[in-house]
């Protein structure tokens, strides 16, 4: 996740466990962690989640990777831009603006 999104994610749960099924939810996890468990996910990757939600899921065996709300939505920017152009928006007016910074401080050795 760190390499793919160019950020230092926060990780809740076991970082070295095997992973076959990844649940991905852009933006905020909200209450969708239960759906990830029901779907058999080995990990959930999302933008943000409440402290107790992430803690609860990790304790129940579902690691949570938090990328940052903005970073988790970046993969969808091209899809939205292409849809706008397909709908008739002049490509010169479809401008992609990505956030070049990370909004939280990284503390090396942080154990959540």
Regions picked out by a protein language model, each given a short descriptive name:
Residues 1-112:
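Hydrophobic structural segments
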């Amino acid at each position: 996740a760190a390499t793919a999104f160019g950020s230092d994610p926060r990780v809740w749960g076991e970082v070295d466990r095997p992973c076959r099924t990844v649940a991905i939810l852009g933006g905020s996890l909200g209450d969708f962690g239960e759906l990830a468990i029901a779907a058999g996910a080995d990990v959930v990757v999302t933008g943000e989640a409440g402290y107790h939600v992430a803690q609860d899921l990790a304790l129940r065996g579902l690691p949570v990777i938090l990328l940052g709300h903005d970073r988790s939505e970046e993969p969808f920017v091209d899809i939205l831009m292409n849809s706008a152009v397909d709908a008739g928006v002049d490509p010169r007016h479809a401008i992609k603006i990505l956030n070049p910074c990370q909004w939280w401080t990284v503390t090396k050795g942080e154990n959540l």
